[in-house]
């Protein structure tokens, strides 16, 4: 409707300790605020934050420490969106995912009163979502119509172009065999309907098109959002 500025996932953030970050090969010099500034926005401009899921590398940037050292939402004017079943899943984590669901990323949002739940496939945000359960319970994949194209925010169903082959799944998947099935069905539809995939974890391939090959669905072309749609 032209009145919303929607952010999908927020990355790691910067509130964790140096020891925490030392376990991960962080790449690049941008943080969320500098990236927003580059795009001409401020964190206060964000009206909605959609979490594909609540693993720390997807939602950590939603929370900051204030001057008193307390946790608070980084986007004071935003509504935060998740799936109700996934939110509960993250609050009562299984042993496999407990280290990925950090209370400091979850509870401050709930306590802020800014939390909203996606109730069905068509959200009031103006785009569809696909629900996937292989990586984690009720992962959301936003499906966005833009300039005549369908863009799917592939999140951790297909985090990089290297994960396009059906058997290549993430070690973090809680139900890897289900991921195989979900990927197979999704990629079949994606190539048939000429979807573009936005790859959240791929430093080399931001936006990709797909093609059928003898070995299955593979990368066709790689683009940046700016070059494909214009800045």
Describe the residue ranges of each PLM region:
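Conserved beta-strand hairpin/beta-sheet module of binuclear metal-dependent hydrolase folds
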Residues: 1-34, 38, 141-156
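Short acidic/His/Gly/Ser-rich catalytic and metal-binding motifs that mark active-site loops
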Residues: 8, 14-18, 89-91, 160-165
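Active-site metal-binding loops of divalent metal-dependent hydrolases
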Residues: 10-13, 54, 85-86, 134-136, ...
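Cap/insert and terminal regions of metallo-dependent hydrolase folds
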Residues: 25-34, 147-231
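Metallo-beta-lactamase
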Residues: 27-41, 45-57, 74-131, 136, ...
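Metal-dependent catalytic neighborhoods of phosphoester/phosphodiester hydrolases
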Residues: 59-70, 209-212
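Active-site glycine- and acidic-residue-rich loops that bind
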Residues: 59-63, 130-140
